[in-house]
From Swiss-Prot:
Component of the Mediator complex, a coactivator involved in the regulated transcription of nearly all RNA polymerase II-dependent genes. Mediator functions as a bridge to convey information from gene-specific regulatory proteins to the basal RNA polymerase II transcription machinery. Mediator is recruited to promoters by direct interactions with regulatory proteins and serves as a scaffold for the assembly of a functional preinitiation complex with RNA polymerase II and the general transcription factors. Component of the Mediator complex. Belongs to the Mediator complex subunit 31 family. GO terms for biological process: regulation of DNA-templated transcription. Residues 126-152 are annotated as: Disordered. The gene is SOH1. Signal peptide: none annotated. GO terms for molecular function: transcription coregulator activity. It comes from Coccidioides immitis (strain RS). Residues 126-144 have a biased composition (Basic and acidic residues). Coiled coil: none annotated. It is found in: Nucleus. Keywords: Activator, Nucleus, Transcription, Transcription regulation. This is Mediator of RNA polymerase II transcription subunit 31. GO terms for cellular component: mediator complex.
Length: 152
């Protein structure tokens, strides 16, 4: 179990089974559809409550905390140069790991709009939980730009 605690990352060698297993997992996280699959299939791991389960279930909460700690561990070492060289899509992989550090993102990722944003631009993903107030402000700014452009 001490080995599973993950305090020391595995040596970065493709002959190391733990290294290759974790490499395959983090590479999968670069795919927004895989993150969506995790959110839908294993919502308790991301701390997403479902109506069919008891919200006070201590095992679901401990699973979510353990998975969040595991994601933090992965992000901590996969961003190091000796490990990042093995990532086929380092930008997308590290972005996904970084976003998964945020509890609000882990809970919001079950929404299709968040997955669509992940597939789109980076700025949309970084603003994954846009408030209604922000949305209204952006709509007003766009309307002003449109009316200013029409009168010029």
């Amino acid at each position: 179990m001490a080995q599973e605690a993950g305090l020391i990352p595995p040596p970065p060698h493709l002959s190391n089974p733990r290294f290759t297993l974790e490499l395959e997992f983090v590479l999968s996280l670069a795919n927004p559809y895989y993150i969506s699959h995790l959110a839908v299939t294993y919502p308790h791991l991301l701390g997403i409550s479902s109506q069919s389960t008891d919200n006070d279930d201590p095992s679901a909460s401990s699973d979510a905390k353990a998975f969040a700690a595991y994601l933090a561990y992965l992000y901590d070492y996969w961003k190091r140069p000796e490990y990042v060289q093995f990532l086929t899509h380092p930008g997308a992989t590290l972005r996904a790991l970084r976003l998964l550090q945020e509890e609000s993102f882990r809970k919001a990722v079950i929404r299709p709009q968040v997955i669509e944003a992940l597939l789109g631009t980076t700025t949309e993903v970084d603003l994954h939980v846009e408030s209604e107030e922000d949305r209204e402000k952006n709509n007003e700014e766009q309307a002003e730009k449109g009316s200013n452009g029409a009168t010029s």
